[in-house]
Amino acid sequence: MRARLILSSLLLASLAGCGGGSDFADLQSYMDEVRARPKGTIEPLPKFQPYEAFTYSAASLRSPFQPPVKIDLTVRQKGNKVIKPDETRVKQFLEGFNIETFEMVGTLSNAQGTFALVKGAGGVHRVRVGDYLGRNDGKVVGISEGKIDVIEIVPDGEGNWLERPRSLTLKERS
């Protein structure tokens, strides 16, 4: 019973705070004062220049990381119609890969001769003089302890063929 009395008195006291007193005159006067103040001006948005798309046009130029190649057309090596790849020859496995993917890793010598070990094309492969290496009909013509000499047959751009010497050198471990 006593709890009911306390609860009822608290309820009545809280309802008395919600009475109909409409004494908001000071709030209303402040709001009128704020509305009467002069309005500020907002600066207009700045004019933006339209975006111009950039097109990279140096893709066909020489890479800055490669040394410049001077081509003198008068001194340029001319191709020969006698030199041409043997189309009837059966291609070897290592001819299916670019020669740049191969790296010389060592040599082997036994009763059968000297072999070079090249790393690339998914493993380490053994090559000897007379084998072919790379996509340009590169024939191994010499093997020494430090390098493999290869002669490639490449087109000269005028319907003839050139023999281009290349070599794979043994990379020293550092």
UniProtKB/Swiss-Prot annotation:
The keyword Acetylation does not apply. Residues 1-17 form the signal peptide. Keywords: Cell inner membrane, Cell membrane, Lipoprotein, Membrane, Palmitate, Signal. It comes from the Bacteria. GO terms for cellular component: plasma membrane; type IV pilus. A lipid is attached at residue 18 (N-palmitoyl cysteine). Disruption phenotype: Deletion mutants lack surface pili. It is found in: Cell inner membrane. Pfam families: PilP. The keyword Cell membrane applies. It is a lipid-anchor. InterPro entries: PilP. One of its GO terms (biological process) is type IV pilus-dependent motility. A lipid is attached at residue 18 (S-diacylglycerol cysteine). Inner membrane component of the type IV (T4S) secretion system that plays a role in surface and host cell adhesion, colonization, biofilm maturation, virulence, and twitching, a form of surface-associated motility. PilN/PilO heterodimers form the foundation of the inner-membrane PilM/PilN/PilO/PilP complex which plays an essential role in the assembly of a functional T4 pilus. PilP connects PilO to the secretin PilQ. In turn, the PilM/PilN/PilO/PilP/PilQ complex facilitates transit of the pilus through the periplasm and clamps the pilus in the cell envelope. Interacts with PilO, PilN and PilM. Interacts (via C-terminus) with the outer membrane secretin PilQ. This is Type IV pilus inner membrane component PilP. It comes from Pseudomonas aeruginosa (strain ATCC 15692 / DSM 22644 / CIP 104116 / JCM 14847 / LMG 12228 / 1C / PRS 101 / PAO1). The lineage of its organism: Bacteria, Pseudomonadati, Pseudomonadota, Gammaproteobacteria, Pseudomonadales.
